[in-house]
Design a protein with these regions (language model features):
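A cross-taxon signal for low-complexity, glycine/charged-rich
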Residues: 1, 6-26, 30, 35, ...
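Active-site loop/lid in soluble adenylation, ligation, and acyl-transfer enzymes
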Residues: 32-95, 99-103, 109, 231-264
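Short, conserved charged micro-motifs
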Residues: 90-92, 128-131, 218-224
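Short coil-to-beta-strand
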Residues: 107-120
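Contiguous, small/hydrophobic- and glycine-enriched helical/loop subdomains that border
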Residues: 117-173
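A contiguous pocket-lining binding segment that forms or flanks enzyme active sites
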Residues: 149, 153-220
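C-terminal accessory segment of soluble enzyme catalytic cores
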Residues: 189, 194, 200-264
């Protein structure tokens, strides 16, 4: 993917450390001005992971989170993720140069490397879960656009077009296409270019939205600004061993298998 970007997940300042009940051991409370969520946990996954492990951690968080959570993460090596409904034949040519993985969410083909990748997990017990998938999708992207505006970028959330077909499960574009070459409704755009897209999966446990931001240089602390545009009450957290152990199991039995990769 052209336009790979530098990203930063740095956390600045010292804050009082408390005990987290969800995805990590320690978190630090801070306040912001906008609210989509009453409380949002920010999981900082500073260790680059394989493509299969990244997908597995997201699913493990969806299974266990009781508070809305946003996770920012990196990739161990250049990777390509493609949607649940995608065909393996559409991405096969990118191996072995890139790590390939089928997402549990829908959508098209996404090239990963230096992008800022995130997942938002909304447990079924949270009131936001009762909103429609497209409404949640748009509200998250409006918060992202606001974060860009806060650093002087003229970001907009695109209107019109198809939000993804097959409901929001198919994310932002046809499953066999490069997501960032095919902007559609609710994408985040700057100067006519798509710089952020995402895809969703809704289950009885909650809603998972996986997104990528690329094609633009991000300033240090941007990830925090994005999170704080989603909630007035953010809490920092690490991924705990229980989540990691469950993710390793999912990576071994599901995301890292040939049967999952070649499902279609």
């Amino acid at each position: 993917m052209s336009g790979e970007v530098e990203t930063s997940l740095e956390i600045s300042g010292s804050r009082r450390i408390q005990r987290s009940l969800d995805c990590g051991r320690n978190y630090k409370v801070r306040q912001a001005t906008r609210t989509l969520f009453a409380h949002l946990i920010i999981c900082h996954d500073g260790r680059p992971q394989s493509a299969s492990m990244n997908m597995a951690i997201d699913e493990a968080l969806l299974e266990s989170a009781s508070i809305p959570t946003i996770r920012f993460y990196r990739w161990r090596s250049a990777a390509v993720s493609f949607g649940y409904f995608g065909r393996f034949s559409d991405v096969a040519s990118y191996a072995p140069e890139r790590d390939l993985v089928r997402r549990w969410t829908g959508g098209g083909i996404v090239f990963h490397g230096n992008d800022l990748t995130y997942s938002t997990i909304i447990p079924a017990s949270d009131p936001v879960f009762n909103q429609s998938s497209i409404t949640i999708y748009q509200r998250i992207h409006h918060a992202l656009a606001d974060a860009f505006k806060g650093v002087g970028e003229r970001a907009i959330v695109a209107g019109g077009g198809d939000p993804g077909g097959r409901g929001m499960r198919n994310g932002l574009s046809a499953s066999g296409h490069n997501c960032f070459a095919n902007p559609v409704r609710a994408d985040v755009m700057i100067d006519g270019r798509k710089i952020a897209g995402a895809a969703q999966r809704r289950t009885r446990s909650g809603l998972l939205q996986q997104g990528s931001i690329q094609g633009i240089s991000l300033k240090a602390g941007f990830a925090e600004s994005f999170a704080e545009a989603l909630s007035a009450n953010c809490s920092d957290s690490d991924i705990n061993e229980e989540i990691l152990n469950r993710a390793r199991e999912l990576a071994q039995r599901k995301y890292g298998t040939e049967s999952w990769l070649r499902k279609r």
